[in-house]
Regions:
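N-terminal amphipathic alpha-helix/helix-capping segment at the start of soluble metabolic enzymes
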Residues: 1-23, 27, 35, 143-155
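Active-site-adjacent beta->alpha loops and helix N-cap segments on the catalytic face
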Residues: 5-8, 29-31, 55-67, 85-91, ...
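Active-site mouth loops of central-metabolism enzymes
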Residues: 17-31, 75-87, 155-169, 247-259
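Conserved, mostly hydrophobic/aromatic
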Residues: 21, 47, 96, 177, ...
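Short, acidic/polar
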Residues: 27-40, 60-61, 86-93, 166-178, ...
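Active-site cofactor/substrate anionic-group-binding motifs, chiefly glycine-
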Residues: 43-83
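Catalytic beta/alpha-barrel core
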Residues: 47-57, 79-80, 106, 183-193, ...
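Active-site pocket-lining/capping segments in soluble small-molecule metabolic enzymes
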Residues: 122-151, 161-166, 206-264, 283, ...
Length: 298
């Protein structure tokens, strides 16, 4: 079997993986990026590179992903359809693969109206579902949608997003995404083990877990206040009251938050079908690296 990326091989081999996330800097200096993710190198199995999250401009996600690949880090390029038409997206897929970026996460992207340049007009050419199908066609059929051949075709390991906390999963929709070309899923934050277990059982009963890999989203809080903010402002995020109270009563809320993450990881990894953890958090690369290290030796 030809593996599309190191992450692909690890998941195929049954390794429980840890992925992390970074937002490219507001800088044209690549050393700024490398310094930011230094603690994650050799710790995370792969690092997501976000694509102007919150519709605020940062260094190009593709450029940042290439820099990581050139420094022996397996990147996951978050590719949004918000800013590019189909021609630009297809060109980026070929270019990314040519320079060692093989994991991609296909997303819609945040609405420009929520960013700091709200007058921006989104591309609105294709949606993320079409992007997945396009990427799959390019790697499998070795051709562009126009029919022109690609030689050699790009090596791509295609990911999508899911939100376990929003209720019972739509298994038909998820199966459709897999048929469309998705190889793995990274989820929104999950902080309730029981809900996750129920969610994964539904997926297992539908035969989904044998077809794909689920990496469950998790991350540390800066404080109880930030946990409440996530509850109120992030779609599909539900932080239980007991976790918020635990943080409020802690002498060191940041340290307590790390403990919460570590404990949830130990529970999540025992749930059937969970193949890894995707750790997120704004400017929390060092904290996330500590959580991964502790989890790997436990």
């Amino acid at each position: 079997m030809e593996y599309q990326s190191p992450l692909h091989k690890k998941l195929h081999d049954g390794v429980f993986v840890f992925t992390a996330e970074t937002t490219p800097p507001d800088s044209s200096n690549k050393e700024t990026l490398l310094k930011k993710i230094k603690s994650l190198k050799g710790v995370a199995d792969a690092i997501n590179v976000t694509d102007s999250p919150g519709a605020k401009v940062h260094m190009s996600a593709l450029t940042a992903a290439i820099i990581l690949a050139q420094n022996d880090i397996d990147p996951i390029l978050q590719l949004t359809v918000r800013d590019r038409n189909r021609l630009a997206l297809q060109g980026d897929l070929v270019g990314a693969s040519a320079l060692g970026v093989h994991n991609i996460l296909c997303l819609s992207g945040d609405d420009p109206k929520v960013g700091d340049q709200p007058e921006t007009k989104p591309a609105q050419d294709i949606d993320s579902t079409t992007l997945v199908a396009t990427a799959n066609m390019m790697r499998t059929d070795k051709k562009f949608p126009s029919g022109r051949a690609i030689d050699p075709a790009p090596k791509l390991f295609i990911g999508g997003a899911e939100v376990p906390s929003k209720g019972k999963p739509n298994t038909e929709k998820i199966l459709g995404k897999i048929k469309n070309g998705i190889d793995f899923f990274q989820t929104q934050y999950v902080f309730e083990a029981k809900k996750l277990e129920e969610y994964m059982k539904v997926l297992n009963d539908a035969g989904i877990l044998e077809k794909t890999s689920f990496l469950i989203g998790l991350g540390p809080f800066a404080s109880a206040k930030s946990a409440k903010w996530m509850n109120d402002n992030l779609f599909g995020v539900d932080v239980p009251d007991e976790i918020i109270k635990r943080l409020e009563q802690a002498k060191d809320q940041k340290e307590e938050s790390k403990k919460v993450c570590f404990e949830l990881i130990q529970i999540f990894r025992e749930i059937k079908g969970v193949k890894g953890i995707h750790l997120m958090g704004h400017k929390k690369e060092e904290v996330i690296a500590e959580i991964i290290k502790e989890s790997k030796i436990s």
